[in-house]
Amino acid sequence: MTTRIDTRFAELKKQGRSAFVTFLMGGDPDPATSLAIIKALPKAGADIIEIGMPFTDPMADGPAVQAAGRRALNAGMTVTRTLQMIHDFRKGEGSTPVVLMGYYNPIYIYGVEKFLTDAKAAGVDGLIVVDLPPEEDSELCIPAMKAGLNFIRLATPTTDDKRLPAVLANTSGFVYYVSITGITGSAAADSTAVGAAVARIKRHTTLPVCVGFGIRTADAARGIAERSDGAVVGSALVDALSGSLDAEGKATAKTVNAVADLAAALAAGVRSARQAAE
Amino acid sequence: MNSLPNSFRSGPDARGHFGIFGGRFVAETLMPLILDLEKAYTEARADAAFQRDMAGYRKDYIGRPSPLYFAERLTEHLRDISAASGRAGGAKVYLKREELNHTGSHKVNNVLGQILVARRMGKKRIIAETGAGQHGVATATLCARFGLECVVYMGAVDVARQEPNVIRMEMLGAKVVPVQSGTRTLKDAMNEALRDWVTNVHNTFYCIGTVAGPHPYPMMVRDFQSIIGDETRAQMQEAEGRLPDSLIACIGGGSNAMGLFHPFLDDSSVEIFGVEAAGHGLDKLHAASLTGGRPGVLHGNRTYLLMNDDGQIQDAHSISAGLDYPGIGPEHSWLHETGRVTYLSATDEEALSAFQLLSRLEGIIPALESAHAIARVVELAPERPKDHLMVVNLSGRGDKDVPQVGDILKGRRK
Ligand SMILES: Cc1ncc(COP(=O)(O)O)c(C=O)c1O
């Protein structure tokens, strides 16, 4: 089975460069603006789009992403609407992979089988579910693989060589290396340490390794892109979005461009990097 | 309902499941630490020196065993109620006096155990979440005793309504962090503690306050609290020469209840009742996860949760900060579905009345949490015969609630 994610990484390899991966919260600050933003991302240079599914209790997220989730929930975002949004995005865009990222409970309550069927039909390519470690693979990871969706797992600095094989066993699409122990939006790890960690993971897998958490600038994105197969940027984009809102937290005429402009700058940083060391 | 197991005491399984409940639903960063903790606890549990250490601190630092006290005037009052309705019954009510423990509640039993495990693991920094503040006070106390750094997360709403405990924690040298996210109560304090743990995982031990969270916490906390039921068994033998006929305890996450219940789960003659917080009423805002919720996944485990149709966690409400949690320990969810334990609820108003009743009849001011259990005793005991032995877990004392209840009563007198 070849997914949009596999195809995208094969193309990038041919072009000799790393991926620029964006994260935004689905439905932030409202479903219509959120759709307009994700529609603008491929043109701005996003190679893979991650979309957060809002949850009331995002245990691993920092203040920026927490607030984004609140805005989305307050604007009426639900699992059904998130899938609908991706369906609408897919009408004009067939090649950019979309990865849903979130917590397990909303998926569990929606119903795992129904969720996988509907996500696949909407054009979702992969899932990242923060609170499902390999110990709970039977919940969603295995059914997702069977449904033809990539299940992308996080590896962290605490994932040692002994544990890595368990983490990688049912991972597909790519590996998401979280460069620090901490919540989203924390300070960045230095790129030397990231390089060593990526090399360590690559000893255990042939999957692409993307790196996220704490990347805020084009320079930082270049540094990470040089040492990995992709740089993931989330909180900085969420901050650009929230900085464009009015006093009530509502979208303004500036909102879509505020995100797209930052994405374009970050994409340029990634594209100026050399291909990651094989 | 599941088919009944041979023993209700054998859970969880190797992966931390009680039936479909429990498990380990946490971020990858934490998994290696949780596996380390499981190993450390398994070793400690089998180590005679650890058990000896714990027994020593229980006796001389906590002040155990806590008494099992026959509440004579409460019993007489309940017999009068029974007689007035022509039933001529009224169980003999005993109070298991966990409120007499050092720091004022059952929470210290668990914290002692976890801090001794943390010491074995070489951890120097302890974090905890707290609702009513009792778990925070117990944690701050044992951190002071063992010279450990202590950070306690507490919802900003709870910081305001449990001020005496905030002051105590600070006096004991702990740092209290008011949590402003979400609903600013216990569940948000737990989220914030998890965020801290993910960030400082290399040197930090997370001391969870109830029988919830990822495996092995529900099992470990239950084991540490089971001293309540073990003592009750021996004390009732001594007082009455037999087992009690019923047990009753309030449920926030369910640790004081689990501690009392667990040693009796296989004694089929013993009726067991847990009391959740019905807040303003079960059709309004409340914190009764079993009655008003359904199975879901939060804070590292699968259990009954209050949520909406989209799987978003709903706000819980209880007058009592210690019960104001939208979930419940996974073992309780399992005991509920197997039918071994009967779960009831009591409203804010019922708890307030029970609070005053026990204060006036027995000279014991209970915690508002414990008052929820007393509120159901007032109904259950008059229906039982006079030779029925009922044990209520008095999980904590009401000192922390004096300002809050005082304000409410003053407001009503005007
Ligand atoms: C006195 C007292 N009782 C009961 C509880 C509820 O906790 P649990 O249900 O874990 O026993 C608390 C929690 O703060 C408490 O302080």
From Swiss-Prot, chain A:
* UniProt cross-references to InterPro entries, sorted A to Z: Aldolase_TIM, RibuloseP-bd_barrel, Trp_synthase_alpha_AS, Trp_synthase_suA
Reaction catalyzed = (1S,2R)-1-C-(indol-3-yl)glycerol 3-phosphate + L-serine = D-glyceraldehyde 3-phosphate + L-tryptophan + H2O
Pathway in which the depicted protein is active: Amino-acid biosynthesis; L-tryptophan biosynthesis; L-tryptophan from chorismate: step 5/5
Q: Which PROSITE patterns match?
A: TRP_SYNTHASE_ALPHA
Keywords from the named record: Amino-acid biosynthesis, Aromatic amino acid biosynthesis, Lyase, Tryptophan biosynthesis
Q: Which SUPFAM superfamilies match?
A: Ribulose-phoshate binding barrel
Q: Does the keyword Calcium apply?
A: no
Indicate yes or no for the key word Nucleotide-binding: no
Give the enzyme class. lyase
- Annotated TM spans: none
- One Pfam family for this entry, by name? Trp_syntA
A cellular component term from Gene Ontology for this protein is:
cytosol
The UniProt family comment states: Belongs to the TrpA family.
In Swiss-Prot or TrEMBL terms, this protein is called Tryptophan synthase alpha chain
Q: Tell me the organism.
A: Nitrobacter hamburgensis (strain DSM 10229 / NCIMB 13809 / X14)
